[in-house]
């Protein structure tokens, strides 16, 4: 085959761009007073995640509203999810105090979970693969916990950065470390979720691309691996929602008790 023919064949072959489905694209351009308020694919899929979470809970407990004795499978799944998050709150904040924050924490868990899982649908978009989304969620948790600590303890909140039992001479070193550690919380919380969602979905996209470009005879192994990895990504999506939720509870507990 001549060099020209090889070049033409290479040009005709489909190009792999595993990061293409992470691109934020404007769907409805909107600009007000020079501020870009466009509705993007990320916005739409976040709305869908909220809608799915709402419908999941509404349909799940429809049987209870109708006084049915035997719960449906959907209701059982919703009750398991409800109990699972409530146990996280009870273990990391405490029963009486934690229940006040349970609705917000449960909503946050469902939002992160469905944002993660909806991204596995072919042709969809994963909002939590965008650092601006995860950073917004993490900063919301951070500012809420910080505000809660200031309201509850006032100037006593400063004591959070002074480790107990540390010699006075070491406080010069330890206090700045504690402050930096505290300020890095939203960074670690957001980057962890963003990095895991981006990495996992990128590998999955590469596997499906190779499976689609191989002849039928060599298709089975990559397709099987991609299917198994999809199941693994479902697990990762759940685990990341769990980690985000449990760290939120830890930060709220620190704000309440200055641990």
Curated annotation (Swiss-Prot):
PANTHER family hit by this protein: ATP SYNTHASE SUBUNIT A
GO molecular function terms listed in the Swiss-Prot or TrEMBL record: proton-transporting ATP synthase activity, rotational mechanism
Annotated source species: Magnetococcus marinus (strain ATCC BAA-1437 / JCM 17883 / MC-1)
Pfam families, alphabetized: ATP-synt_A
Alphabetized SUPFAM superfamilies for the sequence: F1F0 ATP synthase subunit A
Domain of life: Bacteria
Primary gene name: atpB
UniProt name for this protein: ATP synthase subunit a
InterPro entries: ATP_synth_F0_asu (IPR000568), ATP_synth_F0_asu_AS (IPR023011), ATP_synth_F0_asu_bact/mt (IPR045083), F0_ATP_A_sf (IPR035908)
Localization per record: Cell inner membrane
Keyword Transferase found: no
HAMAP family: ATP_synth_a_bact
């Amino acid at each position: 085959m001549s060099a020209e023919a090889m070049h033409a064949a290479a040009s005709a072959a489909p190009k792999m761009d595993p990061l293409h489905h992470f691109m934020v694209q404007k769907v409805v351009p909107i600009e007000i007073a020079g501020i870009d308020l466009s509705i993007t694919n990320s916005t739409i899929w976040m709305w869908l995640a909220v809608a799915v979470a709402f419908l999941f809970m509404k349909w799940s407990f429809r049987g209870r509203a109708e006084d049915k004795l035997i719960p449906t499978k959907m209701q059982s799944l919703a009750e398991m999810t409800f109990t699972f998050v409530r146990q996280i709150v009870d273990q990391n904040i405490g029963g009486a105090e934690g229940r006040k924050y349970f609705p917000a924490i449960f909503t946050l868990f469902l939002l992160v979970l469905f944002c993660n899982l909806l991204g596995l649908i072919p042709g969809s978009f994963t909002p939590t693969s965008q650092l601006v989304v995860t950073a917004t969620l993490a900063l919301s948790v951070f500012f809420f916990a910080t505000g809660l600590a200031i309201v509850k303890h006032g100037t006593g909140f400063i004591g959070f950065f002074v480790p107990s039992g540390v010699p006075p001479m070491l406080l010069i070193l330890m206090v700045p470390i504690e402050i930096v550690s505290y300020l890095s919380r939203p960074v670690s919380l957001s980057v962890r979720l963003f990095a895991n969602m981006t990495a996992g979905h990128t590998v999955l996209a590469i596997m499906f691309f190779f499976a689609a470009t191989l002849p039928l005879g060599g298709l089975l192994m990559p397709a099987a691996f991609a299917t198994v990895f999809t199941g693994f990504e479902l697990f990762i999506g759940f685990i990341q929602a769990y980690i985000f939720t449990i760290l939120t509870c830890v930060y709220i507990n620190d704000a309440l008790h200055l641990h």
